[in-house]
Amino acid sequence: MLLICISVLAAISAHPLSSGEMRAAVSNLVREIDSTHLTTKPSLKIIEGLEDNTVSTGESVTLRCDVLSTPTGVIYWEKDGQRIQGDKELNVFEKVLNAMGPTVESGIITSSYQIPCANLHHIGSYKCVATNGHDTVESSAKISVEGQTVKCKSTRRSAPVITMSTESRFELQDNAATLICRADRRANWNWMFEDKKIDFDSGRYELLPSGDLLIRKIQWSDMGSYFCIAHNKYGESRGETFLYPTKKHIA
């Protein structure tokens, strides 16, 4: 299976594909890996969705979705059918790292979309969409805004806001596990395990460009709370997740 993964990725690199062809190739690779290595059937369920809401101009609104997913998925947002936050990119890198044996790749992902100062142009139908390469689920709500248009403070010079993160993650010991943490803008990233800053020089931890944390060969001692910190010169935002390493069953 590892050779298949490498061959597919090499072919993609050697022969640039259109975005549609690329998505199809990655999707096929995901299904191929998961069909062989997942310990349970793929599943995807929204456990906290959206509700219609009416707010006054100038109010802050936060929309949130929580999703239980096997394998790990991603969440993106749409307004009136147009994507406004996030993407459909799945974590193929972790799958390739774990392609030599069984994987659990299960947990809860949470995502939020923030309207810091509601105005009339924010009226519309909002949708959170979750996908894991096998299924797609969504939750939608209508946001109504009442009142006269107000002048809102610019958010350009603001601290980053965490927009998607892993709330909990289950994975077999000795496998790699990725803890998701994404922000609404470019940010500097730090990660902590319990009360200690993670040492990226140790070789087991890798900070991915997206802000995610990759942990190689997780052990029982890695169980606990992890905190991601996205920061810039204007401030910071934090997310928290819990990692559950599980024992491999020896036949």
Swiss-Prot record:
One of its GO terms (biological process) is homophilic cell adhesion via plasma membrane adhesion molecules. Its main location: secreted. Residues 1-19 form the signal peptide. Residues 42-144, 160-244 form the Ig-like C2-type domain. It is found in: Secreted. One of its GO terms (molecular function) is cell-cell adhesion mediator activity. Disruption phenotype: At the L1 larval stage, display defects in the positioning of the ventral nerve cord (VNC) axons characterized by axons of PVQ and PVP neurons, but not of RMEV, HSN and AVK neurons, drifting into the opposite VNC side (axon flip-over). These defects are not enhanced in a zig-4 (gk34) mutant background or in zig-4 (gk34) dig-1 (ky188), zig-4 (gk34) sax-7 (nj48) or zig-4 (gk34) egl-15 (n484) mutant background. In a zig-1, zig-2, zig-4 or zig-5 or zig-8 mutant background, cell body positioning of ASI and ASH head neurons is normal. This is Zwei Ig domain protein zig-3. The lineage of its organism: Eukaryota, Metazoa, Ecdysozoa, Nematoda, Chromadorea.
